[in-house]
UniProtKB/Swiss-Prot annotation:
Protein name: Homeobox-leucine zipper protein ATHB-7
Biased composition (Basic and acidic residues): 151-183
Domain of life: Eukaryota
Species per Swiss-Prot/TrEMBL record: Arabidopsis thaliana (Mouse-ear cress)
Keywords: DNA-binding, Homeobox, Nucleus, Stress response, Transcription, Transcription regulation
Induction, per UniProt: By water deficit, by abscisic acid (ABA) and by salt stress.
Subunit text: Interacts with TBP2 and TFIIB1.
Gene for this chain: ATHB-7
Protein's job: Probable transcription activator that may act as growth regulators in response to water deficit.
GO biological process: positive regulation of DNA-templated transcription; response to abscisic acid; response to water deprivation
Length: 258
Protein backbone atom coordinates (compact mmCIF):
# COMPACT_ATOMS: atom_id res chain seq x y z
CA UNK A 1 0.00 0.00 0.00
CA UNK A 2 1.42 3.46 -0.92
CA UNK A 3 1.47 6.54 1.29
CA UNK A 4 -1.66 7.87 -0.40
CA UNK A 5 -3.49 4.76 0.71
CA UNK A 6 -3.51 3.03 -2.60
CA UNK A 7 -2.51 -0.57 -3.23
CA UNK A 8 0.37 -1.26 -5.49
CA UNK A 9 -0.14 -3.75 -8.30
CA UNK A 10 2.12 -6.30 -6.60
CA UNK A 11 0.12 -6.21 -3.41
CA UNK A 12 -3.15 -6.52 -5.28
CA UNK A 13 -1.92 -9.63 -7.04
CA UNK A 14 -0.82 -11.24 -3.72
CA UNK A 15 -4.01 -10.46 -1.78
CA UNK A 16 -6.12 -13.42 -3.05
CA UNK A 17 -3.51 -15.89 -1.92
CA UNK A 18 -3.45 -14.36 1.57
CA UNK A 19 -7.24 -14.58 1.80
CA UNK A 20 -7.27 -18.26 0.81
CA UNK A 21 -4.55 -19.00 3.32
CA UNK A 22 -6.57 -17.40 6.11
CA UNK A 23 -9.66 -19.43 5.14
CA UNK A 24 -7.72 -22.71 5.18
CA UNK A 25 -6.30 -21.92 8.58
CA UNK A 26 -9.76 -21.12 9.92
CA UNK A 27 -11.19 -24.43 8.56
CA UNK A 28 -8.30 -26.36 10.09
CA UNK A 29 -9.01 -24.82 13.47
CA UNK A 30 -12.70 -25.72 13.14
CA UNK A 31 -11.88 -29.34 12.25
CA UNK A 32 -9.63 -29.58 15.26
CA UNK A 33 -12.40 -28.18 17.38
CA UNK A 34 -14.98 -30.74 15.97
CA UNK A 35 -12.83 -33.78 16.70
CA UNK A 36 -13.26 -35.46 20.07
CA UNK A 37 -10.61 -37.18 21.97
CA UNK A 38 -10.98 -40.71 23.25
CA UNK A 39 -11.46 -39.40 26.75
CA UNK A 40 -14.25 -37.10 25.65
CA UNK A 41 -16.00 -39.85 23.60
CA UNK A 42 -15.79 -42.26 26.52
CA UNK A 43 -17.32 -39.72 28.90
CA UNK A 44 -20.05 -38.89 26.42
CA UNK A 45 -20.87 -42.62 25.92
CA UNK A 46 -21.16 -43.17 29.65
CA UNK A 47 -23.46 -40.18 29.98
CA UNK A 48 -25.56 -41.36 27.01
CA UNK A 49 -26.10 -44.77 28.62
CA UNK A 50 -27.63 -43.11 31.66
CA UNK A 51 -29.55 -40.38 29.82
CA UNK A 52 -30.27 -40.17 26.10
CA UNK A 53 -31.47 -36.58 26.41
CA UNK A 54 -29.74 -33.96 28.52
CA UNK A 55 -31.27 -30.88 30.01
CA UNK A 56 -29.70 -27.54 29.03
CA UNK A 57 -28.10 -27.15 32.48
CA UNK A 58 -26.47 -30.61 32.24
CA UNK A 59 -25.29 -29.90 28.72
CA UNK A 60 -23.45 -26.76 29.89
CA UNK A 61 -21.95 -28.59 32.85
CA UNK A 62 -20.79 -31.56 30.73
CA UNK A 63 -19.32 -29.26 28.08
CA UNK A 64 -17.39 -27.32 30.75
CA UNK A 65 -16.04 -30.58 32.23
CA UNK A 66 -14.90 -31.91 28.85
CA UNK A 67 -13.63 -28.57 27.51
CA UNK A 68 -16.24 -28.48 24.76
CA UNK A 69 -18.89 -26.11 23.64
CA UNK A 70 -22.48 -26.85 24.79
CA UNK A 71 -23.53 -26.93 21.15
CA UNK A 72 -20.91 -29.65 20.44
CA UNK A 73 -22.32 -31.78 23.23
CA UNK A 74 -25.90 -31.29 21.94
CA UNK A 75 -24.92 -32.24 18.37
CA UNK A 76 -23.05 -35.35 19.57
CA UNK A 77 -26.07 -36.49 21.61
CA UNK A 78 -28.38 -35.86 18.65
CA UNK A 79 -26.24 -37.94 16.28
CA UNK A 80 -25.83 -40.64 18.90
CA UNK A 81 -29.60 -40.92 19.36
CA UNK A 82 -30.10 -41.25 15.60
CA UNK A 83 -27.50 -44.03 15.34
CA UNK A 84 -28.88 -45.72 18.46
CA UNK A 85 -32.43 -45.65 17.09
CA UNK A 86 -31.27 -47.03 13.78
CA UNK A 87 -29.38 -49.83 15.53
CA UNK A 88 -32.34 -50.50 17.80
CA UNK A 89 -34.68 -50.69 14.82
CA UNK A 90 -32.31 -53.09 13.10
CA UNK A 91 -32.18 -55.28 16.20
CA UNK A 92 -35.95 -55.26 16.54
CA UNK A 93 -36.29 -56.01 12.84
CA UNK A 94 -34.00 -59.01 13.15
CA UNK A 95 -36.01 -60.28 16.11
CA UNK A 96 -39.28 -59.78 14.30
CA UNK A 97 -37.86 -61.42 11.19
CA UNK A 98 -36.79 -64.45 13.19
CA UNK A 99 -40.22 -64.66 14.84
CA UNK A 100 -41.86 -64.38 11.44
CA UNK A 101 -39.75 -67.19 10.04
CA UNK A 102 -40.67 -69.38 13.01
CA UNK A 103 -44.35 -68.59 12.62
CA UNK A 104 -44.16 -69.25 8.88
CA UNK A 105 -42.56 -72.63 9.54
CA UNK A 106 -45.25 -73.46 12.11
CA UNK A 107 -47.93 -72.31 9.67
CA UNK A 108 -46.62 -74.63 6.98
CA UNK A 109 -46.55 -77.51 9.47
CA UNK A 110 -50.11 -76.76 10.59
CA UNK A 111 -51.20 -76.47 6.97
CA UNK A 112 -49.81 -79.91 6.16
CA UNK A 113 -51.38 -81.33 9.32
CA UNK A 114 -54.71 -79.78 8.35
CA UNK A 115 -54.54 -81.35 4.89
CA UNK A 116 -53.78 -84.73 6.48
CA UNK A 117 -56.71 -84.35 8.89
CA UNK A 118 -59.05 -83.30 6.07
CA UNK A 119 -58.02 -86.37 4.07
CA UNK A 120 -58.53 -88.63 7.10
CA UNK A 121 -61.91 -87.03 7.80
CA UNK A 122 -63.00 -87.55 4.19
CA UNK A 123 -61.89 -91.19 4.33
CA UNK A 124 -63.78 -91.80 7.58
CA UNK A 125 -66.85 -90.05 6.18
CA UNK A 126 -66.85 -92.24 3.08
CA UNK A 127 -66.35 -95.37 5.22
CA UNK A 128 -69.24 -94.34 7.50
CA UNK A 129 -71.53 -93.67 4.55
CA UNK A 130 -70.60 -97.02 3.00
CA UNK A 131 -71.26 -98.85 6.28
CA UNK A 132 -74.59 -97.05 6.70
CA UNK A 133 -75.65 -97.98 3.17
CA UNK A 134 -74.69 -101.62 3.78
CA UNK A 135 -76.69 -101.66 7.03
CA UNK A 136 -79.68 -100.12 5.28
CA UNK A 137 -79.48 -102.70 2.50
CA UNK A 138 -79.17 -105.52 5.04
CA UNK A 139 -82.08 -104.15 7.06
CA UNK A 140 -84.18 -103.86 3.90
CA UNK A 141 -83.30 -107.44 3.00
CA UNK A 142 -84.23 -108.69 6.48
CA UNK A 143 -87.53 -106.82 6.35
CA UNK A 144 -88.26 -108.31 2.93
CA UNK A 145 -87.49 -111.81 4.24
CA UNK A 146 -89.71 -111.25 7.27
CA UNK A 147 -92.52 -109.89 5.11
CA UNK A 148 -92.18 -112.81 2.68
CA UNK A 149 -92.15 -115.32 5.55
CA UNK A 150 -95.18 -113.67 7.14
CA UNK A 151 -97.04 -113.70 3.84
CA UNK A 152 -96.13 -117.36 3.29
CA UNK A 153 -97.21 -118.23 6.83
CA UNK A 154 -100.52 -116.44 6.38
CA UNK A 155 -101.04 -118.26 3.09
CA UNK A 156 -100.35 -121.59 4.76
CA UNK A 157 -102.75 -120.75 7.60
CA UNK A 158 -105.43 -119.77 5.11
CA UNK A 159 -104.89 -122.96 3.14
CA UNK A 160 -104.96 -125.02 6.32
CA UNK A 161 -108.20 -123.37 7.36
CA UNK A 162 -109.70 -124.23 4.00
CA UNK A 163 -108.46 -127.81 4.14
CA UNK A 164 -109.05 -128.39 7.83
CA UNK A 165 -111.62 -131.19 8.33
CA UNK A 166 -114.47 -130.94 10.72
CA UNK A 167 -113.55 -131.42 14.31
CA UNK A 168 -114.13 -135.04 15.30
CA UNK A 169 -114.39 -136.22 18.85
CA UNK A 170 -112.38 -139.28 19.88
CA UNK A 171 -113.77 -142.52 18.56
CA UNK A 172 -115.33 -144.94 20.94
CA UNK A 173 -114.28 -148.51 20.34
CA UNK A 174 -116.79 -151.07 21.47
CA UNK A 175 -116.58 -154.81 21.75
CA UNK A 176 -119.41 -157.32 21.89
CA UNK A 177 -119.66 -160.68 23.59
CA UNK A 178 -118.15 -162.50 20.64
CA UNK A 179 -115.01 -160.41 20.57
CA UNK A 180 -116.04 -158.24 17.60
CA UNK A 181 -114.98 -154.64 17.60
CA UNK A 182 -117.06 -151.66 16.62
CA UNK A 183 -116.52 -147.91 16.54
CA UNK A 184 -119.02 -145.29 17.52
CA UNK A 185 -118.62 -141.69 16.38
CA UNK A 186 -120.93 -138.75 16.25
CA UNK A 187 -120.00 -137.35 12.84
CA UNK A 188 -122.49 -137.82 10.04
CA UNK A 189 -123.40 -136.48 6.69
CA UNK A 190 -125.65 -133.49 7.10
CA UNK A 191 -127.38 -134.31 3.83
CA UNK A 192 -128.78 -137.61 5.30
CA UNK A 193 -132.11 -137.61 6.97
CA UNK A 194 -132.77 -138.65 10.54
CA UNK A 195 -133.29 -142.30 9.61
CA UNK A 196 -130.00 -142.43 7.74
CA UNK A 197 -128.19 -140.83 10.69
CA UNK A 198 -129.67 -143.37 13.12
CA UNK A 199 -128.76 -146.21 10.80
CA UNK A 200 -125.15 -144.99 10.67
CA UNK A 201 -124.91 -144.94 14.46
CA UNK A 202 -126.35 -148.42 14.70
CA UNK A 203 -124.06 -149.69 11.96
CA UNK A 204 -120.95 -148.27 13.66
CA UNK A 205 -122.04 -149.53 17.09
CA UNK A 206 -122.89 -152.98 15.86
CA UNK A 207 -119.91 -153.10 13.53
CA UNK A 208 -118.99 -156.58 14.69
CA UNK A 209 -122.15 -157.97 13.20
CA UNK A 210 -121.20 -156.87 9.72
CA UNK A 211 -119.17 -160.04 9.46
CA UNK A 212 -122.36 -162.03 10.03
CA UNK A 213 -124.90 -160.65 7.58
CA UNK A 214 -126.90 -163.85 7.65
CA UNK A 215 -127.45 -163.48 11.38
CA UNK A 216 -128.71 -159.94 10.95
CA UNK A 217 -130.91 -161.00 8.09
CA UNK A 218 -132.39 -163.66 10.32
CA UNK A 219 -133.11 -161.05 12.98
CA UNK A 220 -134.82 -158.60 10.65
CA UNK A 221 -136.34 -159.87 7.41
CA UNK A 222 -138.07 -157.55 4.99
CA UNK A 223 -141.77 -158.09 4.36
CA UNK A 224 -144.14 -156.70 1.87
CA UNK A 225 -146.39 -154.91 4.29
CA UNK A 226 -146.23 -156.48 7.75
CA UNK A 227 -145.26 -159.63 9.58
CA UNK A 228 -147.06 -162.78 8.31
CA UNK A 229 -147.89 -164.16 11.72
CA UNK A 230 -147.78 -163.46 15.40
CA UNK A 231 -145.18 -166.19 15.81
CA UNK A 232 -142.81 -164.38 13.53
CA UNK A 233 -143.39 -161.15 15.43
CA UNK A 234 -142.69 -162.86 18.75
CA UNK A 235 -139.55 -164.45 17.33
CA UNK A 236 -138.32 -161.09 16.06
CA UNK A 237 -139.03 -159.43 19.39
CA UNK A 238 -137.24 -162.21 21.29
CA UNK A 239 -134.17 -162.07 19.09
CA UNK A 240 -134.00 -158.29 19.33
CA UNK A 241 -134.28 -158.38 23.12
CA UNK A 242 -131.50 -160.94 23.33
CA UNK A 243 -129.27 -158.85 21.11
CA UNK A 244 -129.82 -155.74 23.18
CA UNK A 245 -129.17 -157.63 26.42
CA UNK A 246 -125.89 -158.96 25.10
CA UNK A 247 -124.78 -155.54 24.01
CA UNK A 248 -125.75 -153.90 27.26
CA UNK A 249 -123.60 -156.40 29.17
CA UNK A 250 -120.49 -154.87 27.59
CA UNK A 251 -121.39 -151.16 27.34
CA UNK A 252 -124.21 -149.53 29.24
CA UNK A 253 -126.64 -147.66 27.08
CA UNK A 254 -126.51 -144.74 29.46
CA UNK A 255 -122.89 -144.18 28.72
CA UNK A 256 -123.53 -144.47 25.04
CA UNK A 257 -126.30 -141.86 24.91
CA UNK A 258 -124.77 -139.50 27.48
Amino acid sequence: MTEGGEYSPAMMSAEPFLTMKKMKKSNHNKNNQRRFSDEQIKSLEMMFESETRLEPRKKVQLARELGLQPRQVAIWFQNKRARWKSKQLETEYNILRQNYDNLASQFESLKKEKQALVSELQRLKEATQKKTQEEERQCSGDQAVVALSSTHHESENEENRRRKPEEVRPEMEMKDDKGHHGVMCDHHDYEDDDNGYSNNIKREYFGGFEEEPDHLMNIVEPADSCLTSSDDWRGFKSDTTTLLDQSSNNYPWRDFWS
